[in-house]
């Protein structure tokens, strides 16, 4: 860490420690506080000209207090936050949190995580590198990507580049006080192509922890143009049941639905088709899904969760069997289970491939639909019913034949997960979910007729 960042972290730790001491004196039974600070730079270009240049610099402090009710058995909770960090604003925020807690109904599951579960192991995770690029650097990158995309038949809607860095400090009245750091860089191009009055749009993007690790501007622009050009002349296919291959970036959404279904809030609200499914076979026996909070440079690498609980590497799915939920301390108490270190979400979820590259999956599918985009919100997590608008390509003999749009793919997530045929080695690592493409034996497709 450079001296500037060290100084910022020490200042933030001092603020959090002072808040915790103050609310303790004010009579809070337990308390937690979180300070976060971030800065970023983003630019966009259009038609070879700079469109926007934006700089953000944000700070915030959130305070949560827990008060004992009259019989001392249950706790009530009050939270308040502020973006103004002078002593008067912080004092007012404490007042608000205390007042809200005094008015809130007590809950036997409220309170801090058990002290024994708080993190004591802090690994170097490679999640932060100082961002030294200037606005001119990002503008040059965006213009170069735009120029690479603006080839015959393709126009560029927008080219963009962004960098950011942030840190946060979390502390609670159990004596826990720790920080975490993050930096991000991303670049994207959105392109358009037209044929016979029909406009098609596609894009490509990349995201890393450090701008120097991004795909080159030229590659991003060329990929956006190629994908857009491929979509020209799209048509519908006849309704029916077909083999379906979800391209890796779209397959991530299927992993996302699984993660939602095993999250604590969905489970204790009886809003998940995977409630009471621990130990049940959900996927084929060849499938393993891991969670690795210690992945170096991972987008969701964490030594501790939002409750301060120690994270751990584990299997969510092992040999097709559901072996873990995603539980905060509160959710665990509601469900009568143990917390898993997932307050705030999952950490670097990795689906282990069992098949070859993308072209191998096309050959394995032989004839069917390749889905490259889904849209709409047709997912019912209570029942697992799935229905989304989609576009992509028709495939025959393992070869892409023509683009397809204005179709709907449907099924039930229970059946889809259980019937998964293959996961490709074409792993997309541009987010906290890492997976290759997913192949299904058949899905219901609504198109023409």
Give the positions of each predicted feature.
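Active-site bordering "gate/hinge" segments
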Residues: 1-302, 306-309, 318-321, 399, ...
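Dual-mode signal for accessory low-complexity, basic/Gly-rich regions
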Residues: 210, 261, 275-449
């Amino acid at each position: 860490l450079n001296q500037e960042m060290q100084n910022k972290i020490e200042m933030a730790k001092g603020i959090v420690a002072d808040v915790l001491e103050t609310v303790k004196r004010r009579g809070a039974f337990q308390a937690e506080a979180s300070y976060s600070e971030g800065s970023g730079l983003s630019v966009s270009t259009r038609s070879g000209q700079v469109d926007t240049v934006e700089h953000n610099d944000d700070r915030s402090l959130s305070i949560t207090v827990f008060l004992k009710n009259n019989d001392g058995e249950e706790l009530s909770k009050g939270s308040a936050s502020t973006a103004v960090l002078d002593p008067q604003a912080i004092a007012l925020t404490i007042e608000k949190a205390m007042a809200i807690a005094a008015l809130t109904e007590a809950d036997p599951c409220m309170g801090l995580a058990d002290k024994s579960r708080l993190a004591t192991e802090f690994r170097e995770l490679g999640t932060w590198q100082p961002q030294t690029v200037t606005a001119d650097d990002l503008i040059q990158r965006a213009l170069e990507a735009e120029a690479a995309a603006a080839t015959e038949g393709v126009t560029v809607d927008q080219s963009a580049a962004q960098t950011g860095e942030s840190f946060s400090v979390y502390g609670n009245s159990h004596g826990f006080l720790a920080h975490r750091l993050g930096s991000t860089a991303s670049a994207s191009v959105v392109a358009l192509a037209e044929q016979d009055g029909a406009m098609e749009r596609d894009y490509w993007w990349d995201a890393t922890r450090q701008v120097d690790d991004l795909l080159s501007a030229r590659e991003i622009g060329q990929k956006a143009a190629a994908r857009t050009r491929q979509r020209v002349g799209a048509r519908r296919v006849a309704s029916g049941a077909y083999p379906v291959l979800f391209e890796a970036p779209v397959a991530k959404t299927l992993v996302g639905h699984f993660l939602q279904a095993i999250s604590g809030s969905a489970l204790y609200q009886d809003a998940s088709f995977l409630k009471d499914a621990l130990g049940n076979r959900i996927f084929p026996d060849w499938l393993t899904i891991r969670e690795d909070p210690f992945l170096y440079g991972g987008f969701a690498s964490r030594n501790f969760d939002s409750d301060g609980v120690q994270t751990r590497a584990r299997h969510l799915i092992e040999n097709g069997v559901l072996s873990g939920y995603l539980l905060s301390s509160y959710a665990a108490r509601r469900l009568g289970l143990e917390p898993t270190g997932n307050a705030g979400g999952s950490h670097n979820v990795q689906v282990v491939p069992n098949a070859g590259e993308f072209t191998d999956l096309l050959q394995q599918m032989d004839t069917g639909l390749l889905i490259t985009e889904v849209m709409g919100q047709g997912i019912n997590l209570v029942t697992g019913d799935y229905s989304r608008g989609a576009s992509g390509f028709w495939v025959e003999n393992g070869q892409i034949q023509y683009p397809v749009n204005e179709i709907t793919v449907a099924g039930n997530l229970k059946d889809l997960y259980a019937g998964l045929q293959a996961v490709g080695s074409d792993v997309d690592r541009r987010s906290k979910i890492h997976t290759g493409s997913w192949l299904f034996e058949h899905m219901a497709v609504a198109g023409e007729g």
